[in-house]
Amino acid sequence: MAAAVLLAVGLRAARRTLAAAGARGAQVRGNAGVSDGSEVAKAQKAAPGGASPTIFSRILDRSLPADILYEDQQCLVFRDVAPQAPVHFLVIPRKPIPRISQAEEDDQQLLGHLLLVAKKIAQAQGLKDGYRLVVNDGKMGAQSVYHLHIHVLGGRQLQWPPG
C-alpha cells in the first residue's frame, strides 16, 4: 500500500513537471497525463523544424522524467503520459529524426531496430494477443512532437478504422 502511494505521488510529480515544461514552450502531449482530445490541435500548432528541443530530446538527456521501460545505444522506450490504451508506450530513436518522411536510406537499420524493440517490449508488457503500432507524420497525420516515435498500444480490443 505504501509503495502504491509513493508511486502515485511520484507519477503526479512527474506529470506536474511535464505540464510545467509545456507552459515554458516545450512540446508536451496531454495535460498532466489526461488526454484532452486536442492532439490534432496540438499537431496543428507544433513546430515541425526541430529547431528547439522537443520533450523527447529532454527525456533522452534526462532533463525531464519518464517511466522508462527499456533503453539501448539506439533507442529509448517509455510509457506515454496520456495513455490511449491500458498499455501505451513510445519507442524513440536517440538520433533526432523529426518525421518518418525525413528518414534517410542510412536510417534503415535503425528503423528496423525500433520495430524489433517495439515487439520485444510489447511481449514483455504481456501483449500476447496483439497490439497496434502507430507512427504519425506531419500536421495532417496529427504529429504533435517532431521527433520520430512509434506508439505501441494494447491491452484491450482496439477498434478499426482509427479515424
UniProtKB/Swiss-Prot annotation:
Residue positions, PTM N6-succinyllysine: 45, 128
CDD domains: PKCI_related
Active site feature: 149 (tele-amp-histidine intermediate)
Record-stated family: Belongs to the HINT family.
Residues of the transit peptide: 1-17
Keyword presence, Ligase: no
Motif, Histidine triad motif: chain positions: 147-151
Class of the enzyme per the UniProt entry, highest EC level: hydrolase
N6-acetyllysine PTM positions: 119, 128, 139
One BP annotation, GO: steroid biosynthetic process
Name of the protein this chain belongs to: Adenosine 5'-monophosphoramidase HINT2
Catalytic activity entry: adenosine 5'-phosphoramidate + H2O = AMP + NH4(+)
Domain HIT: 55-163
Annotated GO MF terms: adenosine 5'-monophosphoramidase activity; nucleotide binding
InterPro entries: Histidine_triad_CS, Histidine_triad_HIT, HIT-like, HIT-like_sf
Primary role: Exhibits adenosine 5'-monophosphoramidase activity, hydrolyzing purine nucleotide phosphoramidates with a single phosphate group such as adenosine 5'monophosphoramidate (AMP-NH2) to yield AMP and NH2. Hydrolyzes adenosine 5'-O-p-nitrophenylphosphoramidate (AMP-pNA). May be involved in steroid biosynthesis. May play a role in apoptosis.
Annotated residues for binding of AMP: 63, 80, 136, 142-145, 149-151
Enzyme Commission number, as recorded: 3.9.1.-
Record's keyword terms, sorted: Acetylation, Apoptosis, Hydrolase, Lipid biosynthesis, Lipid metabolism, Mitochondrion, Nucleotide-binding, Steroid biosynthesis, Transit peptide
GO annotations of cellular component type: mitochondrial matrix; mitochondrion
Cellular compartment(s): Mitochondrion
